UniProtKB/Swiss-Prot annotation:
Keywords: Aminoacyl-tRNA synthetase, ATP-binding, Cytoplasm, Ligase, Nucleotide-binding, Protein biosynthesis. The gene is metG. It is found in: Cytoplasm. Residues 526-537 have a biased composition (Basic residues). Monomer. ATP binds at residue 304. It comes from the Bacteria. A motif ('KMSKS' region) lies at residues 301-305. PANTHER family: METHIONINE--TRNA LIGASE, MITOCHONDRIAL (PTHR43326:SF1), METHIONYL-TRNA SYNTHETASE (PTHR43326). GO terms for biological process: methionyl-tRNA aminoacylation. It comes from Mycobacterium leprae (strain TN). This is Methionine--tRNA ligase. The keyword Iron does not apply. CDD domains: Anticodon_Ia_Met, MetRS_core. Residues 503-537 are annotated as: Disordered.
Length: 537
């Protein structure tokens, strides 16, 4: 099988995970699952970035050892991913022993290339961004606080700290040449243009070590320095592929990575610094870096100060994991900023899932159970209406594959639901409930053909939504009598076998019932109900 290596960004475990983390994990997982179902040998890496000043300060504020806080919070991130059905192959932590070896080796390689030198640094540093800023990149607010212009985060002055620098200035032409030769290296297009513009303006050497704290990977031969967190963090992608053992089967098979999935706020680290590090170290660059957008809550940016940060686990407990996965990938054009609201989730659940998909499956399968002994019927000759619908369904895989390759999962789901919309119109226009009552053998044959055609397109839809809704799609395929070896995408072209015995039909996508408290926030109401039930227990 052809290998495919896909990664998420690794999260700082300095605080609880939020809906933005879940969004990236779900999207990346959907692609990983799609590739597996499409016959590829997938390696899926995710994890946490446990080093850096941000984590150290969070531990100090909590009054616990830094390693303890990092370990505890990393566990929270891993459990959330498991609850979201994220099918990772490895959950890496940057405190893992093999990662220390990888980080030290890439440093040695960059040093051997002459790209690391010792100097002193004075300037502004953002703990939240784990990033340095020159004076022109900051501004002083009316309240006397200085912030980074780009991110709006607080910056503090670092005074003449001894540090190692990386010769980023030497890589301007090499980076621009790579972008030009590999137009798909950065996506979406707006981020590619942003990066090219940034690099074209020239690059400055930047600090890659710290001596003012010790929570990180020590610099080889210089233990008084710890690596700048981004060298350490970015190297996790290599660690996950077996580096520094470049002769290993793992590294030979999976590196370079096919896709780094990240948020747009860290595009420079991944599309400028990371390829420069790899060029310096003599390591092949990843194939593609894609930066998704941010989620807003009812049109507002989420922040702790506003109090509108969404807990993904509360959403899952209220609406269901597959429902949340579907909403996030269907509602928002991937790569753009998007809006989250409880009302929008409920609309998708009731309109798309319960009505368009669930109701079509339930009606057709119930008719098979009631009138045909729960056995897939033998169709008679197909009419033009049957053929048109089946042709649309048959063509979905190629279209959806192209959408997933371009990280356009919303378009893939849109295409599937357009077909389901046509299937619902077909079912209504063919009126199988009337055909069923006819004593004409021709009408009975037509009845069986309509049900067969409907069940077949439901099967194809269920196959194709597996990456997004694995549990629900699995239940739908169970109802259609499909065994585990009939669920890869190769099965799309193999027609549903007449004579297949089906289990009694059950609903897969129930409608969401509004909260008992009219106008209440369903997530908060659900949380209150859970607390009430706990007290009763």
């Amino acid at each position: 099988m052809r290998p495919y290596y896909i990664t998420t960004a690794i999260a700082y475990p300095n605080a609880a995970p939020h809906i933005g983390h879940a969004y990236e994990y779900i999207a990346t997982d959907a692609i990983a699952r799609f590739k597996r179902l499409d016959g590829l040998d997938v390696r899926f890496l995710t994890g946490t970035d446990e080093h850096g000043l941000k984590v150290a300060q969070a531990a100090e504020a909590a009054g616990v050892p830094t390693a303890q806080l990092a370990r505890r919070n990393s566990g929270v991130f891993q459990r959330m991913q498991e609850a979201l059905h994220i099918s990772f192959d490895r959950f890496i932590r940057t405190t893992d022993a093999d990662h220390y070896k990888a980080a030290k080796e890439i440093w040695r390689r960059m040093d051997a290339a002459g790209d690391i030198y010792l100097g002193t640094y004075s300037g502004w540093y953002s703990v939240r961004d784990e990033r340095f800023f020159v004076d022109s990149e900051t501004k002083l607010l009316d309240n006397g606080i200085r912030v980074a212009v780009e991110t709006g985060t607080l910056v503090t002055w670092t005074e003449k700290e001894q540090t190692y620098f990386f010769r980023l200035s030497a890589y301007v032409d090499k980076l621009l040449a790579h972008y030009d030769a590999n137009p798909d290296f950065i996506g979406p297009e707006v981020r590619r243009n942003e990066v090219i513009s940034f690099v074209s303006g020239g690059l400055e050497d930047f600090s890659i070590s710290r001596t003012s704290f010790d929570w990180g990977v020590q610099v080889p031969e210089h233990p008084d320095h710890v690596m700048y967190v981004w060298i350490d963090a970015l190297t996790n992608y290599l660690t996950g592929a077996g580096f520094p053992d470049t002769d290993s089967e793992l590294f030979g098979r999976y590196w370079p990575a096919n896709l780094h999935m990240i948020g747009k706020d860290i595009i420079r680290f991944h599309a400028v610094y990371w390829p420069a590090f790899l060029m310096s170290a003599g390591i092949e660059l990843p194939r593609r870096i894609f930066a998704h957008g941010f989620l807003h809550n009812h049109g507002e940016k989420m922040s702790k100060s506003v109090g509108n940060i969404v807990d993904p686990m509360a959403l899952v407990q209220t609406f269901g994991v597959d429902q949340v996965r579907y909403f996030l990938l269907r509602e928002i054009p991937f790569g753009q900023d998007g809006n989250y609201s409880e009302e929008a989730i409920i609309t998708r659940m009731n309109t798309d899932l319960a009505n368009e998909f669930g109701n079509l499956a339930q009606r057709s399968l119930s008719m098979v159970a009631k009138n045909l002994g729960g056995v897939v019927p033998e169709p008679s000759e197909f009419t033009s209406a049957d053929t048109a619908l089946l042709t649309t369904a048959d063509g979905l895989l190629e279209r959806v594959r192209g959408n997933f390759d371009g990280q356009a999962m919303n378009l893939a789901l849109e295409a599937i639901w357009l077909m389901l919309g046509e299937a619902n119109k077909y079912f209504s226009s063919q009126q199988p409930w009337i055909l069923r009552k006819s004593e004409s053998e021709a009408d009975q044959a037509r009845f069986r053909t309509v049900l067969y055609t409907t069940c077949e397109v439901v099967r194809i839809a269920a196959l194709l939504v597996q990456p997004v809704m694995p549990e629900s799609a699995g239940k739908m395929l169970d109802l259609l009598g499909q065994e585990e070896d009939q669920r890869a995408f190769t099965a799309v072209s193999v027609r549903l076998a007449p004579g297949t015995v089906l289990p009694p039909p059950t609903g897969v996508f129930p409608r969401y019932q509004p909260s008992e408290i009219e106008g209440a926030d369903p997530v908060k109401s659900s949380s209150k109900r859970r607390e009430h039930n706990k007290r009763r227990e």
